Amino acid sequence: MKRFFLLFLLLNSAMLSQDYQLVNQFGLFLDATSFALSPQGYFYVADNGSDEIYKIDSLGTEVKAFGGYGWNNGQFDYPIDVSLNALNIFVTDKNNHSIQQFDKDLNFISRLYTREGDNSDAAFGFPLSTDVSSMGDVYVLDSENKRILKFDLFGKYMLQFGGFDAGDFAIKNPLKLIVTENNNILVLDGMSLIVFDLFGNGIAKITLPEKFNSIDKYYNSITLTGDSTIYVSSQEENKLSFTKVNLAAVNGNTKFTSSLAVSNKIYALTYTTIFSFVLSEK
């Protein structure tokens, strides 16, 4: 618990907040649920309204739209989360109980589906989130069984953790997970942030000061996103420290679903668009 103590202190410190100005708005979505940014500068956006994944360049131009409703490879039924590593894109297809993997041009590679398999330990249903470690291991947030499953990059089951037998670290209201640069697994679970190591051992459980919709990462920058608030953190070794940012020129009715902190910029996803903010010079 001690290594993450600073997190709670800074979440409540308004004196440390930073000011960001709105500089751009791009994308037009029906019900965007998640987005990720590649090292090449492309955004990948999951849209539940159209059951599609959009690839958008840094200027906001749509490069490709892919998917559509269905249950075959390359089709989706509630694409709830999109994540990536250096080479591939991973789409969490909630109502199809699967994780689909694509290359950076959205060409289909593979599909992970275990719900009707013989191994109940490996089975997941209605997945909410997926992320990949630096070693290529895939972590799936299983909402049906309220646990996390770990697979290798080829889909071989490795272990499960965070279930009912995890004691204080049992997941109860899972929302999303990320794998940090130092391979800790952070799970947004209701009003708590639960931290596991790569072997599934519980490290910390932190009570959050408000309800958040998402936790996201861009390299070592981590964000917590609420309806109208965003907190930004950088992780150094085993220390997390979040600060709240002030976002100017945003309509009070705007609801954020996800966010990314990239250098001196913040990208905030809503159901219908992406806002781009830049850090104000003081």
Language-model features and meaning:
Residues Q18-K282:
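Eukaryotic scaffold repeat domains enriched in small/polar residues
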